[in-house]
Amino acid sequence: MYDKIKILTFAKGNFIESQQKLKNHLVSIGLTNQKHITDKDLPESFLSEYSEILSFKKGYGYCIWKPFIILEELKSIGDDEILLYIDSTDLPEKIFFDEVLKNFEQREYFFLNRGYNHGQWTKRDTFVLMDCDNQKYYNHVQLEAGVIGLKKNNFNIELVEEWLEYAKNKNILTEHPNISNLPNVNNFVEHRYDQSILTNLFIKKNLVSHRFGTEVIKYNYNQPKIY
C-alpha cells in the first residue's frame, strides 16, 4: 500500500533515539522504504560550505541541513516515488499516511500546518529580503516544516533549491537582529528559520496545505534538546 512512499529523516545528538523510535513505528505501520541520516552522513562539501551557519547550535545551524538533504534525496528517487520527510520528533499515526496518499491523487506535493499565524513566527527581515513584506504573508497560516511530501518533478526540485538558496542568507534564516530597521509584525513571538522561509515560498506559489493536530501527529521526544 505504501510502496511508493520513501521516508527521509535526520537526527543528531539526543535526537537519534527519537529517530530510532520513529523508524520502528513506521515499520510497524508498513512503511519499510526508509532513509535515516545523521550528522555523520553529511558530506564534507556541505559541512565546509555551511560551516558558519552550522556553528549555531539551535537546530544544528537553524535546520539548514533540511532543504539540503531533501534536495539531494528528491533528485535521486524514481519518478513515481513520493519523498516524505519527517522530523525525528514527530510520530504520525497510520491514518496520516492514508491522507497523504489521498492527497497525491490530486497534487504532487504535500504540506501541513497546525493553524499558527505566519507573522507571529517570522522576523521582519525574512519578509523584506524575500520580497514578501505585506499583509498577505503576515496573515497567512504558517507551514509545519516537520513533515513535507514531494514527488520528483522540476517544480518541486526548483522549490527546494530556492528554499536552500534563501537559507544561505543568515539575515533571512537566523535570529540575527533585523538589518532592515523595520519592526517585527505585531504580536511577533519568535522566528522559525527554515519553516519561515518555506512558508514564504509556499504562499508566493499559491500552494495548498492540510491542517493536522497532535492527535494525528504525536510528539516523539522527552529529553533535553541537545544537538
Go through each PLM region and give its residues.
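Glycosyltransferase catalytic domains, chiefly GT-A lineage
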Residues: 1-227
